[in-house]
UniProtKB/Swiss-Prot annotation:
Lineage: Eukaryota, Metazoa, Chordata, Craniata, Vertebrata
A single cellular component GO annotation: mitochondrial inner membrane
Name of the protein: Cytochrome b
GO molecular function: metal ion binding; ubiquinol-cytochrome-c reductase activity
Subunit organization: The cytochrome bc1 complex contains 11 subunits: 3 respiratory subunits (MT-CYB, CYC1 and UQCRFS1), 2 core proteins (UQCRC1 and UQCRC2) and 6 low-molecular weight proteins (UQCRH/QCR6, UQCRB/QCR7, UQCRQ/QCR8, UQCR10/QCR9, UQCR11/QCR10 and a cleavage product of UQCRFS1). This cytochrome bc1 complex then forms a dimer.
PANTHER family in the cross-refs: CYTOCHROME B
Top-level taxon of the source organism: Eukaryota
Species per Swiss-Prot/TrEMBL record: Antechinus leo
Length: 381
């Protein structure tokens, strides 16, 4: 009998991608996050689809339609809680996935890395427009503050902001188009993820040592399908614990009040996963400077392959770079904390120092550490 898995045009693609794919024998649990991100995306699309069936993108009814979903729709509360907390899980996996890439030098697969950065930006855009949809106080004011940053662009800024708003302020037109964007972007993310995988399979996976693993490969199935299934169980466990026991712990209490353009909340802040970038934005007193720093904080990932100075790919055997990497991690956690604090001392100065250290670590200290480690590894006789 002909093996359909290896001959059928469609099954053949799936087979080469997930079944007979040769994978390095030593990849650790840090390589689980790619598949977890795929699952997160599927969860978000499915729950989002069911939410879209009951949601209305009108300023007068958006807030009450979300309340209606939670109160009157069968399991609507569960669908909404899974969708809202699923976004948090998505970003948690994303940050760990990017961190893994930096630690093990995966950014040297330039095409895969660049598509990954575009994916990160697209997911951030999707999450931002999605946060506006419930039309609560923080949704409205978050949208107002962040879209207003466009007006910092010289000459065309104000026109651009009004073009995005569809008027002279965030209003009905803005909400309608944000809903349209929030619906279409996940499908663009799916397409980008396929391209991401396509480029990854051109080179094969990296591994913890950073050494070419061609001499020791194993089939993806059953070894890594089982390993991914374990990660998936942990993901579901954490997501269900969040969604069922503490669904609002990562949200903002201001979003329990309908949007009111006449009443500004005392402290405007985005969701937790944007706080590090928000802290960098706020650390610069100049509006345009802040916007540029905000963009640079993400786009800096694109130049990482060119900042790699070490002779070894992975940080596994590079203790100085490892130390700097964990300082960077601690620094990002500090920035996340600062982003959620009011604009007053000592938070202002801590935010400015942490922002400066963020760029200093990536642009100067880590490349220097690579050169230093090269020097230390040279034979001295």
């Amino acid at each position: 009998m002909i093996n359909l898995r290896k001959t059928h045009p469609l099954m053949k693609i799936i087979n080469h991608s997930f079944i007979d794919l040769p994978a390095p024998s030593n990849i650790s649990a840090w390589w689980n996050f790619g598949s977890l991100l795929g699952i997160c995306l599927i969860i978000q699309i499915l729950t989002g689809l069911f939410l879209a069936m009951h949601y209305t993108s009108d300023t007068l009814t958006a807030f009450s339609s979300v309340a209606h979903i939670c109160r009157d729709v069968n399991y609507g509360w569960l669908i909404r809680n899974l969708h809202a907390n699923g976004a948090s899980m998505f970003f948690m996996c994303l940050f760990l996935h990017v961190g893994r890439g930096i630690y093990y030098g995966s950014y040297l697969y330039k095409e895969t890395w660049n598509i990954g950065v575009i994916l990160l930006l697209t997911v951030m855009a999707t999450a931002f427009v999605g946060y506006v949809l419930p039309w609560g106080q923080m949704s409205f004011w978050g949208a107002t503050v962040i879209t207003n940053l466009l007006s910092a662009i010289p000459y065309i800024g104000t026109t651009l902001a009004e073009w995005i708003w569809g008027g002279f302020a965030v209003d009905k037109a803005t909400l309608t188009r944000f809903f349209a964007f929030h619906f279409i972007l996940p499908f663009i993310i799916v397409a980008l993820a396929i391209v991401h995988l396509l480029f990854l399979h051109e080179t094969g996976s990296n591994n913890p040592t950073g050494i070419n693993p061609d001499s020791d490969k194993i089939p993806f199935h059953p070894y890594y399908t089982i390993k991914d299934a374990l990660g998936l169980m942990f993901l579901f466990l954490i997501l269900l614990l969040l969604a069922l026991f503490s669904p609002d712990s990562l949200g903002d209490p201001d979003n329990f009040s309908p949007a009111n353009p006449l009443n500004t909340p005392p402290h405007i802040k985005p969701e937790w996963y944007f706080l590090f970038a928000y802290a960098i934005l706020r650390s610069i007193p100049n509006k345009l400077g802040g916007v540029l720093a905000l963009l640079a904080s993400i786009l800096i990932l694109l130049i990482m392959p060119f900042l790699h100075t070490a002779n070894q790919r992975s940080m596994m055997f590079r203790p100085v770079s490892q130390t700097l990497f964990w300082i960077l991690t601690a620094n990002l956690i500090t920035l996340t904390w600062i982003g959620g604090q009011p604009v007053e001392q000592p938070f202002i100065i801590i935010g400015q120092l942490a922002s400066m250290l963020y760029f200093l670590l990536i642009l100067v200290l880590m490349p220097l550490a690579g050169l230093f480690e090269n020097y230390m590894l040279k034979p001295k006789w």
